[in-house]
């Protein structure tokens, strides 16, 4: 009987140690996940990159990111204020920052099928959906009624020259949509008609002019 009790105590001790190691392991995993999330947030919130932003006179400092940078996007009164990159394919900048380093927050980037000077009738820009309105996480606000009316201006710099943006529609679409996600196969008229018919919100006061271009900002929905 005494031997049995010792065996039980021994097993209890082993079980306690196993549970301790399991909980310690889970705790360490939790710490790493928190640290990893912090690093992702820090990368997406790196305001030091703003020193490479052109000013309204078209003057920008020497940019180590200029090789793959095709523009700069700013949406007024939001946190969207980022360089626009373009890769050889649409996977290149999913997890790469504008300096070419690995980053889970990735970069804001132009569809690889579009021309880099934004001369296409319709261009498509992607960005990760991040918390705290970082990257294209701020686009969530446009799903609220009335938000578009008060936050419909922005600027896109192309070759350091500023062009005014007017946001006129908000919508949701499947990633397989052949009009929205095939930028080089649709002209501005076709895209505009589709958007008008399917948008959640559409500003009827905005009229397309002859040389106007359409630019879509796309992010995932969670």
Spell out what each predicted region is.
Residues 27-222:
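Solvent-exposed, non-transmembrane regions of membrane-associated and secreted proteins
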Residues 2-26:
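N-terminal Sec-pathway targeting helices
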């Amino acid at each position: 009987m005494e031997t049995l009790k010792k065996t039980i105590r021994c097993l209890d001790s082993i079980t306690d140690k196993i549970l301790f190691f399991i909980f310690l392991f889970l705790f360490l995993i939790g710490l790493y996940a928190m640290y990893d999330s912090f690093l992702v947030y820090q990368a997406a919130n790196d305001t030091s990159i703003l020193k490479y932003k052109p000013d309204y006179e078209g003057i920008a400092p020497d940019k180590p990111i200029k090789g793959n940078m095709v523009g700069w996007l700013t949406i007024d009164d939001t946190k969207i204020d980022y360089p626009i990159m373009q890769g050889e394919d649409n996977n290149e900048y999913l997890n790469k920052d504008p300096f070419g380093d690995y980053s889970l927050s990735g970069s804001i980037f132009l569809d690889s099928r579009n021309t880099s000077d934004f001369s296409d009738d319709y261009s498509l820009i992607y960005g990760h959906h991040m918390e705290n309105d970082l990257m294209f996480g701020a686009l969530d606000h446009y799903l609220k009624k009335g938000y578009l009316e008060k936050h419909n201006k922005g600027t896109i710099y192309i070759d350091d020259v500023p062009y005014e943006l007017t946001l006129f529609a908000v919508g949701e679409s499947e990633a397989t949509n052949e009009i929205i996600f095939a930028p080089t196969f649709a002209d501005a008229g076709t895209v505009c008609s589709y958007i008008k018919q399917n948008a959640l919100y559409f500003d009827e006061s905005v009229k397309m002019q002859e040389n106007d271009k359409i630019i879509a900002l796309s992010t995932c929905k969670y």
